[in-house]
Amino acid sequence: MKEKIPFYNEKEFHDMVKKTKKGTFSGWYIIDKDNKSVEFSGSFNRQFKLNKPVIPVNTEYVTRKEFNEYKVSNDQRLTKIETTLAAQGEQINKLTQTVEKQGEQINQLVQVVLLHGEQINKLTQTVEKQGEQIKELQVEQKAQGEQIKAQGKQIKAQGKTLKSILQALGGINKRLDKIDPPK
């Protein structure tokens, strides 16, 4: 049967230090009367050298069964963490691939936008040329309009002249009719 014996006073502590030959220890120790072994738990500054090797720990005493249970649960927890990390790694890889694909798509869209920009520039130049041509045509039309007005004035003047000539001819015809009546 194991019994837990704490250090209650300084004398016990110094006696323990003398038994171990070196090191300092604070905490408690377990004596197993069945197999005559001693186990320690507490705060160690140096490892104690006893007849049987002792692994210093900074926690309270636990049985081998409790330790194994803890180890199994810890292994399970670590396995879960590993699987979670692996799954997250796969997700990160998928997201990285998605981001790369989107980057490629963005590059393609940028190229399309640049091509559209070039086309827009060409169309703008074409529209500007057409605008200049329209202005030139307007100037020509204006000049033609002025020419037509001038020709129209000339035609009016010629029409007036022809009218006056016709009137004069009409007057001459009347006179001729009066002079030589038709037989």
Curated annotation (Swiss-Prot):
Pfam family, one: DUF16
Highest taxon in the source lineage: Bacteria
InterPro entries tied to this protein: DUF16 (IPR002862)
Family stated for the protein in its record: Belongs to the UPF0134 family.
The protein, known as: UPF0134 protein MPN_100
Naturally occurring in which organism (per UniProt): Mycoplasma pneumoniae (strain ATCC 29342 / M129 / Subtype 1)
Upper lineage: Bacteria, Bacillati, Mycoplasmatota, Mycoplasmoidales, Mycoplasmoidaceae
